[in-house]
Structures are given as C-alpha cells and as structure tokens.
Amino acid sequence: MRMRLGLATLLATASLMAQVAYAGPEIVAGPGVDPACFAPWSADTKFLQWPAKEGPFKIAVVNGFVGNTWRIQMIKTAKAFAEDPSMKDKIAEFKVVSTGTDAPAQLGAIEDFINQGYDAIVTIAVSPDGFDRVIRLADKSNVVLVPFDNVLDTDAVMQVNEDQLAMGRAYGDWVVKQLAELGKTSGKILEVRGLAGNSVDRDRSIGINAVLDENGGPWERVSVVGNWDDGTAQKVVADAIAVHGQFDAIAAQGGTTGVVQAMLDAGHPMVPIAGEAENGYRKLLAKHSAEGLKGISIGQSPGLVAIAMKAAVSALEGNPMPQLISVPLPIATYDQLEDGVNYWTDLPDNFFTVNEFPPCGVNITGPSIMSQSEADVN
C-alpha cells in the first residue's frame, strides 16, 4: 500500500511539475527585443517571455474566412515568407489551413495543431472572444499562439496588428476634411463595412462614426456590408446608389476597387473617398483624381502574417516580446501615388500594395507572393 501511495504521489508531483514548467509566458520588464520591428502598442503594454526552445520550429497558420482577395494574398504571403532565406532554416514544418467562418471549427484546428506538437500557431480569429480554452491549452503545452489582424479581446497572448480604431478615424477625418474644402459640413455618407462579427470591422466602424459625431452634421449615414471583397462591395454599393441616390462621400473598409467601379457604372459623381490599399483602387485614384475622386488609401497589409510569423519565432527563441505589437498605418493619398512605387499598373487589381516592412527587414515581393497558391498546406 505504501509503495502504491508513493508511486501515486510521484506521478501527481511529476504531473504538477510539468504543468508548472509549461504554464505559459512570464511577464517581464521591457524593453523587448528589436523594438524598431516589434514596437509595443503603448507605454502601458506589458512584455511576455517564453522559455527558449531549440529550432527549427513547427509553425502553423490557422485562417478562418478565405472568401476575399485579402485573405487569399495573406495565405500566399505566409507561404512566400516561410520560404524566405531569413525564415526558411528556422522552420522545420509549415502548415496552412482555412476553416471558414465557424468559430468552433477554427478552435478545433488550433487545438489539433497544439496536440500535434506544433511550436507556434499564427491565426486570424473568426471571433474576438471564445479562445480561453485554447489559450490555456497552448500555455500548458508551451505553444506560442499569435493572433493578428482580427485580434482577441484579451491580453493573455502576444498579438500583432495595426490600430483599427485609428484607421477608422483616419477614414473619417479624410472624408470630413475633403467635404469641408468643398464647403460642406453635413451630407450623406456611405459606409462600406467589412466582414461582420470581427474586431477589425467593429473598430474601424467605431472610428469612422466617432469622427462624424465630432464634426458638423447632421450626417445621413447609409451602411452596407461589403465583406472587404471587390465583387460583393461593387454589388452592395450599386444597390445603395439605386436606392438612396447620390452620396457626398464614401468610407470603405475594403473592396474599394469594386466601390469605385460601382460609382463609375452608375454615373455617380466623383466624390471624396477613403479606402483600403488595393492596387486597383490606387490605379483608379491615379486615373480619376482630376475628376474629383480625391481619395486616401490606408493599408491593412496581408503582410502582417509575416510579422506575426517573425514574432512567433522570436518568442520561441526566448526573447522578451510586447504583448501587443503595433505595426504603423501605411497611408497614401491620391496626390502621393507613383506607379512602380506604391501601386503597379502591371499587377492585378486585387493585389494589395503594402508588403514591405523596412524596420523588420521584411520585403515580400509581388512575384514571390503571386507565385504561391491559396490552397491549404496539410
């Protein structure tokens, strides 16, 4: 009996020690490694440090929705960056899966990769909450989980993003200022929203509408859902014009090439517009700005996946990292566009133009991205 009790005690102690050894990252004092690349979100951002592992590492990208060009380019960018000389020797295995808009399916895929012994999982969250269980499992297994783009409403994991609220405010500021130059302090605004139910769409919309609330008015606001997709956005904007008539300005979270094409097809006057960084949109700005299409282009780069992958590897190497990493907003206005520099007439309209991050030494070229497939890597 004593031997049995002793064995049980030893097993319980070993289990407890294993749980303690892999209890997630430690909160440490800053600064973190390479602050020019991995900039903390604010002065209040905490720093996390995982136990160093020996590479090369097993890394997975778990995407959700894959039905628009941004997500497709993101997947291609992840594959291209995994083959980049700066990363290739640090990766032993690399997998990419897209699970659709079903949150349980995404959570299940993340859990599967944790159970398969992957070292890091980079993900675009379908929902900003509901990840508590997989976060605990990742911590228990000493796995680095890195949400980016559509991030989580938690500070328990390292995350990478641009400031979506600031982006929405920049959209709103542009529209308000351009209308003021035309002598308008009120009017009808069309907001083209993104994919419903995630933090990016929510925060950008909050930013846009906060600026409208703070400036002039009254503003008549019409909102349509474009899913950040050119085809969808073109259809819903065409429908909005047919139902509501002319708008004084447009703030589009994405699918901006389709938004402008809907205006052109409907014979809608060229009005101030705020939109994303699609190559086609920038082509149209360059072509029609003299006709009144005064636009701003702010990019949420698909290349964020590369920064998230780079951050994951840095964390696995034992470096202290900001809990929330801030990537600056890449902004270009209609009068700053230059062919071959920040848009390309010889690349497809659905190519997203911002894929270079000089502070991180990351520059994924257009040809290397476009040569990849968007298919899962299993």
Predicted regions: what is each one?
Residues 22-378:
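A residue-level marker of the well-folded mature domains of exported/periplasmic proteins
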Residues 1-22:
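Gram-negative bacterial Sec-dependent N-terminal signal peptides
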